[in-house]
Amino acid sequence: MRIFYPGDTGYDDERSGFQTGLRHEPQVIFAVENARDVEQAVHHAETRGLDHTVHTTGHGLTTPATGVLISTRRMNNVEIDPTTRTARAEAGAVWQQVIEQASPHGLAPLSGDASDVGVVGYTLGGGFSVLAREFGFASDRVRKTEKVGDVVTALEFDLLEIDQVHAGELHFDAEHAEAVFEAFHSWDLPDHVTPTLTTLGDVVRLTFASTRPFDVDHLRVAPTLIDEFGRKPFAEAAGKPLPPHTYQGDNVLLDDLPLDVLHRVRQAASNAGVPVFLGLMPLGGALKTEATHLLKLISPLLGVEQQHEEVFDEVRSFVVGRSRNFRYAVG
Ligand SMILES: Cc1cc2nc3c(=O)[nH]c(=O)nc-3n(C[C@H](O)[C@H](O)[C@H](O)COP(=O)(O)OP(=O)(O)OC[C@H]3O[C@@H](n4cnc5c(N)ncnc54)[C@H](O)[C@@H]3O)c2cc1C
């Protein structure tokens, strides 16, 4: 194991990650390689009255750590057992590793739309996969959790017999947003289909996936900029890594989202004065939760909590909770 203090060569690299707007500011970094190293790091923190925080990829950085940072990226072994259809992933493993090792066996994990996200961090937040409505939360599939205190050193979880999926995306110019939002909202959604709606500046993007066939014709309510839908290997639906960048974001879980409210949210996001991208995922199906929708906001800059809160004000009376995932650079 390597240990880094401020000023050491490698300290900056070790505390950096996908989020470039914020970095951890630890007194010491334990770059762990096994569970015994994690024990040592936790012991160091506890005996000195310091906080300890885990850093894997930095995708989910909320508040920068100031005490002990446990960097897990070297502790990233993944083992697949095709007989029992299980995977064991160490603390630093990312989904791409699991997908690559599982797919030759016709198996797949319940990973999300970015394959470079950490398996453990994602799963601890429930894990909304690209097939979430068909198969439930990633955390529903956990068989065994190995821990040192509150630090998960490895997870063992079920893989699913998934090879090909029906998946794709439609992109529209934002000038058609009202019609696209309406078509998305009125979709008589089969329980096996997992869709998302995302705004990205001038574009509204719809994505959808299932292991079973389904129809998206009714979503083509305006000319499409991208129209891609078909049968493909699960890995292709599992998202490509993005380059590191600066972003701030938060989310709410809702128990209803009437169309007029959705339109007000859309307008509030587009009138926020700063870029606010909106993400909407209908829940239900195999996701056993009282919430019917997950609404996410994300901006490519920091210091926009107030603008996000003003957009969330439009849905305040429907809020029943918040997902631990999809919270970025917020305390
Ligand atoms: C581009 C992008 C796409 C995403 N897509 C999805 C998606 O499709 N579905 C979804 O559900 N989520 C998604 N997320 C959210 C993601 O799952 C969370 O941000 C998650 O916390 C990232 O975990 P990490 O380990 O990669 O990040 P890190 O920033 O390294 O860790 C985040 C936090 O997770 C906890 N954590 C991580 N590892 C451990 C451990 N071993 N023991 C204890 N705690 C630990 C810690 O609290 C840590 O601070 C996405 C995020 C981004 C930025």
Please provide the spans of the model-predicted regions.
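Soluble FAD-dependent oxygen oxidases
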Residues: 1-331
